[in-house]
């Protein structure tokens, strides 16, 4: 009878593993799309932070434009900043890049800024510069530290002892 109906005896795909892999890849792609949308919403918070100017400073702060920027930064700096992508997208932490003003495309220092979950007198969430590292997780230089502290002070951010 199944021959007459031209029905297959086995209703599973010919290659179940291939079908599974395609489905799993599509699920990961959807998760990545959702993460990217969350990142886009949360990255706007960092834009004003990058517009703070420190007189006479040779550095600037740059916000990542995409999650891919975190991967590129991690690769250039040989550290794990890409593993923070989900936390950044969900707004649990923020990552910025300190660059030389004359060479803003070259990685210099990666900076993590975390919300304190406290509210200041203006009703805004407060933030702490949690960590800042050069390539290979090397400590920042005194000059970079001085810039970062001035930048944080202008924004009303505190600075952790992990610098």
What are these regions (language model features)?
Residues 1-163:
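Catalytic-core elements of nucleic-acid end-processing and repair enzymes
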């Amino acid at each position: 009878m199944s021959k007459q109906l031209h029905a297959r005896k086995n209703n599973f795909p010919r290659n179940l593993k291939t079908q599974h892999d395609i489905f799993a890849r599509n699920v990961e792609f959807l998760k990545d799309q959702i993460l990217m949308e969350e990142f886009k919403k949360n990255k706007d918070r960092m834009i004003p932070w990058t517009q703070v100017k420190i007189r006479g400073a040779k550095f600037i702060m740059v916000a990542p434009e995409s999650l891919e920027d975190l991967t590129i930064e991690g690769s250039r700096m040989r550290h794990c900043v890409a593993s923070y992508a989900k936390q950044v997208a969900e707004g649990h932490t923020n990552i910025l890049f300190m660059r030389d003003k004359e060479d803003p495309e070259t990685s210099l220092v990666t900076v993590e800024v975390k919300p304190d979950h406290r509210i200041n007198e203006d009703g805004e969430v407060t933030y702490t510069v949690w960590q800042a590292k050069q390539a290979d997780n090397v400590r920042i230089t005194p000059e970079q530290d001085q810039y970062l502290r001035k930048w944080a002070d202008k924004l009303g951010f505190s600075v952790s002892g992990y610098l």
